[in-house]
Amino acid sequence: MPVIWGGGHFGLDWFFVDWKTDVPEMEFAHINVKELMTVLIAAFKWAPCWVGRHIVVRSDNSATVSAINKSTSRSQDLLPIVKELFWLCVKFDFKLTAIFIPGKLNILADHLSRFHSVDSVFEAKSFLLPSVFDVLYCKFHMSYNTFHLLQSVWEPICVP
């Protein structure tokens, strides 16, 4: 099954991406590219908060973990993303490492990557209470198109 969503969190802040809606050119990209691109999105979003810190990425994708820890990749598809991560680390003075954690144990990130599912929204609620159900708050964590695409799924559980 192709990976069509991604997500990440830092503290209580989070994001969700629908590759087809938000980044159409990534819709058919390899899973390794999407997994590493999710880390890059997180770095762009939170790098200013990471100044002087050691950030540990938890991923269930071994290619992502390896590329981050080695700061390189043999994959020509991953290498530009790794380089961009490297320059963000330099620009914002943070250290980035990664550890492998099976998706079932990386609970919040796993639920965020499946945020289209009502069950995953309810599971994420336990980590992000109460604001995950505030419609206005949700709009800040995903694109306009993705928000409206998912709104029909959320309608029974979101509070206006």
Region spans (language model):
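Flexible, low-complexity interdomain linkers flanking nucleic-acid-processing modules
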Residues: 94, 104, 111-160
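Buried hydrophobic packing segments
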Residues: 38-43
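RNase H catalytic domain
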Residues: 44-108, 114
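Short beta-strand scaffold segments in enzyme catalytic cores
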Residues: 5-9
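Two-metal-ion RNase H-like nuclease active-site motif
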Residues: 1-3
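Glycine-rich loops and low-complexity Gly/Arg-rich segments
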Residues: 20-22, 33, 64-65, 80-84, ...
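A short, polar/acidic, helix/strand-boundary loop motif
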Residues: 10-37, 62-77
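Short C-terminal domain-edge/linker segments immediately following a structured domain
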Residues: 25-27, 86-90, 128-132
